[in-house]
Each structure stands twice: as C-alpha cells, then as structure tokens.
Amino acid sequence: MSNKDWTGNTNSIFKTLGASNHTEKERQNEDYYATDPEAINKLITKYQLPEVIYEPCCGEGHLAKRLMKLGHTVIATDLIDRGFGKGGVDFLKVNKMPENCKCILTNPPYKIALQIILHALEILPEDGECIMFLKTTFLEGKKRFQELYSKCPPVKIYQFSERVMCAKNGDFETMIKGGGSAVSYLFMIFKPHNKNLPTIDWI
C-alpha cells in the first residue's frame, strides 16, 4: 500500500459542487483547530482503521499525514486551502464518497460538526463508518439528541484518558507555552442506520 495524498480528478468526484460562499469560508477559518497526531496513535491501540480514508476537513494535514505514515491512502480536502490536500471543497456539498473509500475520519469545525456527521451518514455506503474527533461536551445537547443520537447513535465512543492538544490555527508552540489543553476530547464512530447503543472505552 502506498503512502499518498489524493491527487485525483476532483471533477469526477466533486463535479456537482458549487462555489463556496464567503460566509462559510470565514466561519471555518475562525473555527480551525489543528489536532495533535497523537490522537491517531491513541485510537489505533483500540480500533483498526481501514486502508482508504477520506479526511474532508484536513486543515494543514496533521491527522492525514499521520495516517499516511501508517500506510493509509488518504483523500484530503478542505473548504479552506491551508497548503495541504485539495482546497475549496465544501464537504456539505459533496454528494458521493471517493472511489473505493468507505471511511470518513476528521476533526470537524465544532460549530457545524452536527451537520457534517449527518451529511457523512448520508453519503457513506451501508457498511461505511464515520470517525469523528470531538469535544466530550458533544455528547450532550437536545438538538444533537433529536437529530442524531435518537436516530443513529454512535457504535463506539473512545474517551481520551489524557488531554489532547488542539491548537487554534495550528499554533501548537503557543499552546504548549500556555500550559497545554484544558479541553476533553473523544472519538465517536458512527455507522449508517445503526440503532444499537454505543460501547465506551478509554484511550
């Protein structure tokens, strides 16, 4: 298996995408938090990831690069072009999965994380999986329960036993100088049409 970022024909996969509006770009630009690749190292101690993974909110590639080093083929896109993957792709307007890919893994912008999960479940195949890095507080919320958890709960929840750094605009140096992370995170794994309650473990 080759380590590679996706450089295929964007027109064939995302041909129905329209131009993203300025408000959407501003929103995500202000909601960009790069994830410490150690999050992937922790996840793979308990969960086996598939060979091909779609990372639709790739940022500067912190998660994607780690996955590639582990031997995965990563299709990396983002609404904002931050110098990695394919920029200018609004995931909420993507209408099908990349070829031979059944897994979406990302740290979505928190303000639209619910919409991203719901959309991922719409475009994934029946045997696909949606792996989301989220704040632990994402577990609560009336709207999330009504629109997501009551209809398609996660199959697995992996709670981090130690704090993981997510640095605004990828500035890990400033975050470390400030004492690291004060926020709790987890991975949620969803599968389309799941009705069973999740199992929880710690990583």
Language model regions located:
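Class I S-adenosyl-L-methionine-dependent methyltransferase catalytic core
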Residues: M1-I203
